[in-house]
Amino acid sequence: MNALKNDRYLRALLRQSVDVTPVWMMRQAGRYLPEYQATRAKAGDFIALCKNTELACEVTLQPLQRYPLDAAILFSDILTIPDAMGLGLYFEAGEGPRFKSPVFSRADVEKLPVPDPEMELSYVTDAVRAIRKALAGQVPLIGFSGSPWTLATYMVEGGSSKAFTKIKKMMYAEPTVMHLLLDKLADSVILYLNAQIKAGAQSVMVFDTWGGVLTGRDYREFSLHYMHKIVDGLIRENEGRRVPVTLFAKGGGQWLEAMAETGCDALGLDWTTDIADARRRVGNKVALQGNMDPSMLYASPERIEQEVSTILQGFGTGSGHVFNLGHGIHQDILPEHAGVFVEAVHKLSAKYHQ
């Protein structure tokens, strides 16, 4: 594998010195880019795009051709594991992801297979290998998965949800079934992320998109416990260097201390958490990623730069910060505004690393 020309993203995750704060964007390969729209049209639909190695590689690289980003992230979806378990993933126009066969009972959970990443999910590992080759050491490649709790919400609800009544019913009325499902998902995520690492992912991220809908006690029992299990089960060194692990829980700002105890290297912050406060609380244990409100990219270039400056100032001097949005970039953002954001991070952060 090629030596990395730019490793500041990996260095920042390990709180090692960097020249400027590294930056990438969640959903940086996405619908706000006209070139992505063109490639997606070529694929036919989103799932076909994810499963086409050549096109998934193409869209992963598109934002790097536009912006001086410090990392690439595998183009895929968090729901690949439940799809590989046979739940029948499809996308309903205006509705988001749906499953043909949601999970309702103990029998449903017991019959779920743990997918073999090099069989049912080989399109993902093939894409990782292709992207690593195409990157040629330009920047590191991030692999990722949904967290067991977040995957379970989609599997039990049958898709997206606002109230999460079905999964909370399972959690409170049948906790043993809930734990059986989460345990199986944790095993699947470990295999899946380790396969991505073996295929060439240089860092991995676990997205707990719906962790924030739980009480603190339930979060520890039904989400964090399984994230801890995943961190313990991951390959932490490959190709002669550490493979950093980032945990991101949307709405999880109140649990940073508990999340930092998992042994992960970094925590992703959504925009509702104050980064200065987060650094005071856990900055001696983990790096922090984030955390500009993605909607700030609707603002003027001057206002975007001002917000970048405020967040950099909030984090303060030294390494241990990867700049990002607090969640995925919106599909109607002007690509030029994303460029202003990325360049502002590099331009304004150098003074914090002298």
Swiss-Prot record:
Entry binding sites for substrate: 27-31, 46, 77, 154, 209, 327
Gene Ontology CC annotations of this record: cytosol
PANTHER family: METHYLTETRAHYDROFOLATE:HOMOCYSTEINE METHYLTRANSFERASE RELATED (PTHR21091), UROPORPHYRINOGEN DECARBOXYLASE (PTHR21091:SF169)
Protein name: Uroporphyrinogen decarboxylase
Any one GO molecular function term: uroporphyrinogen decarboxylase activity
SUBUNIT field: Homodimer.
Signal peptide residues on this chain, from the entry's feature table: none
GO biological process: protoporphyrinogen IX biosynthetic process from glutamate
Pfam family, one: URO-D
Keywords of this entry: Cytoplasm, Decarboxylase, Lyase, Porphyrin biosynthesis
Pathway(s) it belongs to: Porphyrin-containing compound metabolism; protoporphyrin-IX biosynthesis; coproporphyrinogen-III from 5-aminolevulinate: step 4/4
Record keyword Heme present: no
Catalysed reactions, as listed in the record: uroporphyrinogen III + 4 H(+) = coproporphyrinogen III + 4 CO2
Biological function: Catalyzes the decarboxylation of four acetate groups of uroporphyrinogen-III to yield coproporphyrinogen-III.
